[in-house]
Amino acid sequence: MSNVKRGGKFRRARKKVCIFCVDKAESIDYKDVAKLKKYITERGKILPRRISGTCAKHQRQLTDAIKRSRNIALLPFTTE
């Protein structure tokens, strides 16, 4: 974790908690486009773990779901 200097004092940044672990999600559905769009940048790239806050297991499932939904044209590969 990175230390953040704020007002002359160093404060430790809070660790992000995986949203899918909190919800006890078994798997991530590739057809749930609204949820998948939260983990894609405006350029169409998949957000990394350190930004999205997901755990390694759910990041892999998220990546597979995004790639699968791109292949069946539910999500765009890139944006203009």
From Swiss-Prot:
GO annotation, cellular component aspect: cytosolic small ribosomal subunit
InterPro entries reported in the protein's UniProt record: Ribosomal_bS18 (IPR001648), Ribosomal_bS18_CS (IPR018275), Ribosomal_bS18_sf (IPR036870)
List the Pfam families hit by this protein, alphabetically: Ribosomal_S18
Keywords in UniProt for this one? Ribonucleoprotein, Ribosomal protein, RNA-binding, rRNA-binding
- Gene Ontology BP annotations: translation
**Cystine bridges:** none
Which SUPFAM superfamilies did the record assign?
Ribosomal protein S18 (SSF46911)
Q: Does the keyword Ribonucleoprotein apply?
A: yes
- GO terms assigned for molecular function: small ribosomal subunit rRNA binding; structural constituent of ribosome
PROSITE patterns tied to this protein: RIBOSOMAL_S18 (PS00057)
Biological role stated in the UniProt entry: Binds as a heterodimer with protein bS6 to the central domain of the 16S rRNA, where it helps stabilize the platform of the 30S subunit.
Assigned protein family: Belongs to the bacterial ribosomal protein bS18 family.
The record ties this protein, via PANTHER family, to:
30S RIBOSOMAL PROTEIN S18 (PTHR13479), SMALL RIBOSOMAL SUBUNIT PROTEIN BS18M (PTHR13479:SF40)
Its quaternary organisation is: Part of the 30S ribosomal subunit. Forms a tight heterodimer with protein bS6.
- Family annotation (HAMAP family): Ribosomal_bS18
Q: What is this protein called?
A: Small ribosomal subunit protein bS18
The major lineage groups are:
Bacteria, Bacillati, Bacillota, Clostridia, Eubacteriales
